[in-house]
Each structure stands twice: as structure tokens, then as C-alpha cells.
């Protein structure tokens, strides 16, 4: 084993969405960084759907941008369709989503990482960890090289003992066409990490020229919608395309029902649990037997390829069944499959062995982020990469931990959930996971979090000043509109009061009063509308957070002995010792911890402070 002569502050293992974000932000904060990946040609590869964002997920991408991360920027550069979902619903659940060109996403990300000062990229497959007395020292690779580092970030995706299933055929792989990583799982198990299996899947890819789009429903994008917070209209750099909607038929249902036992999922060959909200088509047919048809979304994979992603037809059926199944769908009667669908099982680490900083409780200086923590989705992975990278650098520099709270961000909600809950399925972000989602809208992420990005050195002075200017605009416009009176309908009211009417939006008000109602761009317009229209609800939520903050943020001493607190229930003592929460708020969200236990714990914490 040859030891590389350069030692690094941060070593990142894996160059998926978590790894890229971790490596970039670490280098941006001034650390020397090495990112190791088994294939430089698959950096930031979109292994499943060619899309970024969506409900909950789009909120996270905007938060990453507000903190100084890169997913939003790369998405805007690579996007071939942009939309705002749930436009007719409440403001808390409206979310940006983009179809992206898979190749361009990879190219832009690789180019950005290669040009980032202090960041080195190397092809290599990590097989084991180097540690001494439970402190990380570095990693070793299959190629026979040892790399030394003060901190290590594992972002292995679905590669840890990945096992691909297509019907009755199963074979090792991190994704179709790429080898699995087998040594890393063994290295973690040897060091006492609790590991289990999860499962995910992907649909087949089809040749667009073989599809009859005339019988499908076209789904165009929305103009002027991007992910990066900016002060000018967004103009996508790439040509924009449409997606298309079709549906399964009665014949589809018959084919799946007749072959259900040939599915790897229903044939008993898969032990891992899949994501509840992204089920395979056979799962949908079985669990929703009374439903006549299921929607299928045809999504282009790029502007330089004919391949399309068939969203809604994820399956682990054998290829011959996939062939029949595809051709039973309206518009796909003559479709040509370019890549088969498959399911994949992989190892993940239980959340009770990581802190909310994403540092391991077992080995100091070792951080975990992405699917290795049991999450699913590019966006959840990227956010964890950002947090792991920030805290790895803070550890090297001996600076305080950075843990955004669940009251101020979806990233905080996710960190809290991952470290206080026992996962029984892959974790996916939804707006419903947040208690104060009206405060955590996608349009106000920069207003909530940009001060952290500035303090961490991730946001430039120019971008931070832009966000501060936007805050000022909102406050000034709220006041001005409240003092500007016009006849609207049958009465004279302030424009702020008019905007509070359910049927009135900022854009409709601007059309009626173009001189008085100014255009600040889609994101800022949305923020201004929500701040005025829902002012009462927003103030009530802020008041509630303030009243709960004292107990929520009460710190639990690291050396507290839960077993000695006899008034705690036995289950509470076991769960608290297992998860070792850092605050009373986190402790209260551990399954099995009753309100009475929290009251006892608060008394014990106060007594401990006076020792």
C-alpha cells in the first residue's frame, strides 16, 4: 500500500450529489479537499429521473442556494423545462421543479469542481478506512493507495453492496453499468456501525422517435422560473422542451397481474424496503387494485439524446414482461426500450450513530451524507453534503458546529428527523414534515438563511447584499402598499388589503395597477405577496416558535447518564441512550418518548447544570 504524499483537510468519498456539494463547500471555506470517485465520467450523474426539485425537494434546493451551495446553479444551467408545482394550492406547498439535461448537468458540475481552488479530483474506489483510537486518519483504495486526511466524508449513494434485480436475475452493481462498492460496508461493520438494507428502483428508458406523442397530453413549462435567487428575469440558457402525460390501460394491469410472481419484489428476492411515495408499477397495481389506470409521465433526458424517462413505470419485472407492459401503454404501442428498468438494494447506516452535524458518533472526524443515511433523492443528498462539508471544515478549524433548526429550514427538519427517528423506509422530504411550513416557503429561503451563508464564507459579498436588498424591498413595499389606496371593486381599499383577498394575486394586482404595483421578478413578487396575504398566520407561527424556543433549544449535556434518571420510563432511557439527542426539542421527537419523560428530562438537565 503506497501512501499519497499530500494530506488533506477533507476527503470526500463519492462524487454524486452529496459528494459534489460537500467537496465544493469545503474548498470554498478554505480547506484542502480530495474527492474520490470510482469513475470521473459519472460525476453528479442523475441515476434515476432527469429532474431536480418538486414539493419539499424544490424548497431544499432553494435553501442550498441561500447557503451558498451549487445545486441550484447547476440546475439552472442544465434545465430544459422549469415549472412551479401546486400553483393553485397554498403558498407553503408551491415548489419549483426542473427537467434537466443529464449530460449537461454532469458537464457543468465536473467543470465547476475542476476549477475550484483547493479541490483535487481523483478516480479511485475506496475500500476501507484508516483510523486510530476511534479517530479518522484517511482511506485506502482498491488501487492500492492510502490517502491521509483530517476528516472523511462518506457519500456512497446506492453503491455499498449494491445488488441489481431484473426479474429472477440479480447481480452486483452500484447502478446499471457501474460496479458496487463492497469493501466499505465491511469496514463500517467492523467498526460497529449498524447497517441494514434499503431498496429503490428506476423505470425503463425509451427511444422518443418510437413514441406516438399525438395521443399523449403535452405538459409545457412555465416561463421565468429558475432555482437561483436573482434580481433579474431568468432566461434558461438551453432550449426548452415539453413533457408528456399518458396512462396505463386495462391490458397493462392484466400483464402485471399475470406475472406478479416474476417480479423480484413480489417473488421474494428483495429484502430491502422501498420508498413509500415512489412505488413500482407492480406495487401500485397490487395496492390500488380498484384503480383503472395510472398516470405515466414521459420526460426527455436531454436535448442531445432521443432517450426519455418513463416516470411511473419503475419495476423489477423481467425484461420480457417489461417489453409487453410498455407496449400496453397508450402511445407506447411501438416503443423501443433503450435501457431496462431495475430495482437495486443497498446498505445504509442507522441514524442513531450520527449527530445532526452528520459526524459519526463512533469515529471522530468521519461524516456520512446522502443515501448512506437512509434518504432518497438528489436534493436530500445534496443538502446533507452541504452540511457535512461545512461541519467537516468547522471541525478542522475548531469552529462551532453548524446545525440549522427545523423551525428555520427544511434542511433542519431533515437533520432532526434522520437523527431522532428509526427509518423503516427511505426518507423523502415533504412539506408535511415541517411544523411551520408557512414560514419555510421556497420563495423566502434567501431571507431565512443567507446570513449563515455569509458567516460561513460560502456566499459572496455581492450575493449577500442582493439578499439584504431584497429584504429591504419587501419591508418597504409592504408599508407602501398598505398606505396606497385605490378603488378596487366596489370600495376604496389599500392595495395591501386588496391583495389579501383570496382571488387576488400580486400579478393580477400589477395588471390592474401597473404604476403602483412594481415588478421585482417572480421569486420576490411571490415573497411579497405571501408576506402581505398571510401576515396574520405568519405572525402567529413566529409567536408560537418564540414561546417554544426556550425548551426546544435547551442543550442536553453530553455526559448525562440517562440510566440514573429513575423517573424516566425504561423505554425513554433506552431510546435516549441510543440516539443521544443534543437538545430537548430533538429528544421530544424520538418515537416512544412521552411528554412526561420530557418534563422529567428537563428537570434532570437543570439539576445537571447546577452540579
Swiss-Prot record:
NAD-binding protein involved in the addition of a carboxymethylaminomethyl (cmnm) group at the wobble position (U34) of certain tRNAs, forming tRNA-cmnm(5)s(2)U34. The keyword tRNA processing applies. GO terms for molecular function: flavin adenine dinucleotide binding. Keywords: Cytoplasm, FAD, Flavoprotein, NAD, tRNA processing. One of its GO terms (biological process) is tRNA methylation. Its cofactor is FAD. The keyword tRNA processing applies. Homodimer. Heterotetramer of two MnmE and two MnmG subunits. Belongs to the MnmG family. NAD(+) binds at residues 274-288. It is found in: Cytoplasm. It comes from the Bacteria. One of its GO terms (cellular component) is cytosol. PROSITE patterns: GIDA_1 (PS01280), GIDA_2 (PS01281). This is tRNA uridine 5-carboxymethylaminomethyl modification enzyme MnmG. HAMAP family: MnmG_GidA (MF_00129). FAD binds at residues 14-19.
Amino acid at each position: 500500500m503506497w501512501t499519497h504524499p499530500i494530506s488533506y483537510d477533507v476527503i470526500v468519498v463519492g462524487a454524486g450529489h452529496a459528494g459534489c456539494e460537500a467537496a465544493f463547500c469545503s474548498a470554498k471555506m478554505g480547506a484542502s479537499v480530495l474527492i474520490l470517485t470510482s469513475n470521473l465520467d459519472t460525476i453528479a450523474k442523475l441515476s434515476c429521473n432527469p429532474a431536480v426539485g418538486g414539493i419539499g425537494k424544490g424548497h431544499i434546493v432553494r435553501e442550498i442556494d441561500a447557503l451558498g451551495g451549487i445545486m441550484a446553479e447547476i440546475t439552472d444551467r442544465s434545465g430544459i423545462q422549469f415549472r412551479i408545482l401546486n400553483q393553485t394550492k397554498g403558498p407553503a406547498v408551491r415548489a419549483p421543479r426542473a427537467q434537466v439535461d443529464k449530460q449537461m448537468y454532469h458537464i457543468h458540475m465536473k467543470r465547476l469542481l475542476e476549477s475550484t481552488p483547493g479541490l483535487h479530483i481523483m478516480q479511485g474506489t475506496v475500500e476501507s478506512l484508516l483510523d486510530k483510537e476511534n479517530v479518522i486518519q484517511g482511506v485506502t483504495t482498491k488501487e492500492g493507495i492510502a490517502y491521509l486526511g483530517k476528516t472523511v466524508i462518506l457519500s456512497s449513494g446506492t453503491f455499498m453492496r449494491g445488488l441489481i434485480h431484473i426479474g429472477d436475475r440479480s447481480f452486483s452493481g452500484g447502478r446499471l453499468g457501474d460496479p458496487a462498492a463492497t469493501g466499505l460496508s465491511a469496514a463500517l461493520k467492523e467498526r460497529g456501525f449498524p447497517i441494514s438494507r434499503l431498496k429503490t428502483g428506476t423505470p425503463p428508458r425509451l427511444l422518443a422517435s418510437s413514441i406516438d406523442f399525438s395521443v399523449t397530453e403535452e405538459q409545457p413549462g412555465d416561463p421565468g422560473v429558475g432555482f437561483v435567487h436573482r434580481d433579474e428575469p431568468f432566461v434558461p440558457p438551453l432550449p426548452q422542451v415539453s413533457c408528456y402525460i399518458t396512462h396505463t390501460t386495462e391490458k397493462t394491469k392484466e400483464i402485471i397481474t399475470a406475472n406478479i410472481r416474476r417480479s423480484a419484489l413480489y417473488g421474494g428476492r428483495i429484502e430491502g424496503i422501498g420508498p413509500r411515495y415512489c412505488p413500482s408499477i407492480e406495487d401500485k397495481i397490487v395496492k390500488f387494485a380498484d384503480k383503472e389506470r395510472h398516470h405515466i409521465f414521459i420526460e426527455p433526458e436531454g436535448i442531445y439524446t432521443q432517450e426519455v424517462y418513463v416516470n411511473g413505470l419503475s419495476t423489477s419485472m423481467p425484461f420480457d414482461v417489461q417489453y409487453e407492459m410498455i407496449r400496453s401503454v397508450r402511445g407506447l404501442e411501438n416503443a423501443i426500450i433503450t435501457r431496462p428498468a431495475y430495482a437495486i438494494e443497498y446498505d445504509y447506516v442507522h441514524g442513531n450513530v450520527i449527530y445532526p452535524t452528520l459526524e459519526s458518533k463512533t469515529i471522530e472526524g468521519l461524516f456520512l451524507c446522502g443515501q448512506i443515511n437512509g434518504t432518497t433523492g438528489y436534493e436530500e443528498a445534496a443538502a446533507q453534503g452541504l452540511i457535512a462539508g461545512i461541519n467537516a471544515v468547522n471541525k478542522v478549524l475548531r469552529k462551532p458546529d453548524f446545525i440549522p433548526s427545523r423551525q428555520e429550514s427544511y434542511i433542519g427538519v431533515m437533520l432532526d428527523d434522520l437523527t431522532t427517528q428509526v427509518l423503516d423506509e427511505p426518507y423523502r422530504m415533504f412539506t408535511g414534515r415541517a411544523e411551520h411550513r408557512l414560514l419555510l416557503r421556497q420563495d423566502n429561503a434567501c431571507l431565512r438563511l443567507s446570513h449563515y451563508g455569509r458567516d460561513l464564507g460560502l456566499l459572496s459579498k455581492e450575493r449577500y447584499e442582493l439578499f439584504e436588498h431584497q429584504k429591504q424591498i419587501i419591508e418597504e413595499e409592504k408599508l407602501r402598499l398598505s398606505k396606497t389606496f385605490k378603488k378596487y371593486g366596489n370600495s376604496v381599499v389599500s392595495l395591501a388589503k386588496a391583495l389579501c383577498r383570496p382571488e387576488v394575486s400580486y400579478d393580477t394586482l400589477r395588471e390592474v395597477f401597473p404604476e403602483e404595483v412594481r415588478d421585482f421578478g417572480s421569486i420576490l413578487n411571490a415573497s411579497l405577496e405571501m408576506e402581505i396575504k398571510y401576515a396574520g398566520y405568519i405572525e402567529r407561527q413566529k409567536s408560537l416558535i418564540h414561546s417554544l424556543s426556550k425548551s426546544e433549544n435547551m442543550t442536553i449535556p453530553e455526559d448525562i447518564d440517562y440510566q440514573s434518571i429513575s423517573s424516566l420510563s425504561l423505554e425513554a432511557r433506552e431510546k435516549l441512550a441510543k440516539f443521544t439527542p443534543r437538545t430537548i426539542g430533538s429528544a421530544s421527537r424520538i418515537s416512544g418518548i412521552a411528554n412526561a419523560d420530557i418534563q422529567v428530562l428537563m428537570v434532570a438537565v437543570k439539576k445537571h447544570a447546577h452540579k
